[in-house]
Design a protein with these regions (language model features):
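Charged, low-complexity interaction regions
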Residues: 20-28, 42-46, 67-81
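Amphipathic alpha-helical coiled-coil segments
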Residues: 44, 89-102
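Short amphipathic alpha-helical heptad-repeat segments
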Residues: 4-11, 48-66
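Amphipathic alpha-helices that form helix-helix packing interfaces
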Residues: 11, 18, 34, 55-58, ...
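Short terminal alpha-helical segments
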Residues: 3-35
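Periodic self-assembly scaffolds
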Residues: 28-35, 50, 57, 64, ...
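Short, charged, amphipathic alpha-helical segments
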Residues: 28-32, 53, 77-91
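Non-transmembrane amphipathic alpha-helical segments
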Residues: 59-69, 90, 97
Length: 102
């Protein structure tokens, strides 16, 4: 995790612990963006446009990883559940970003 990400993500209680536990760069990037939105919810439309695509791709990765961990690599139940939650939550965030684009 870069120092800039660490500073931003640490400003929102609980997110840095999740990032540290999961050790997943894309999830950390999504959590950092979530922290930025919590801190300053006014998102420029050009930023929202780029983030919609990026976050949707991250959510897809999270869903695939969770399914993989549920069906093939069944060793880490806790991480699997966090990936499921991340995929759903990021998809919900993407839906909200799409709404503000209208």
């Amino acid at each position: 995790m870069s120092e800039q990400q660490q500073t931003t993500i640490e400003m929102v209680d609980g997110l840095s612990e999740i990032a540290d536990y999961m050790q997943d760069e894309e999830l950390t990037a999504a959590l950092t963006f979530i922290a930025k939105i919590i801190i300053k919810p006014d998102i420029p439309l050009n930023v929202a446009t780029v983030e919609i695509v990026r976050l949707q791709a991250i959510a897809a990765k999270m869903a695939f990883k969770a399914t993989w961990m549920a069906n093939v690599d069944k060793n880490d139940r806790a991480k699997k559940n966090i990936y499921y939650t991340a995929a759903e939550s990021i998809n919900n965030l993407v839906s909200a970003l799409k709404y503000i684009m209208r």
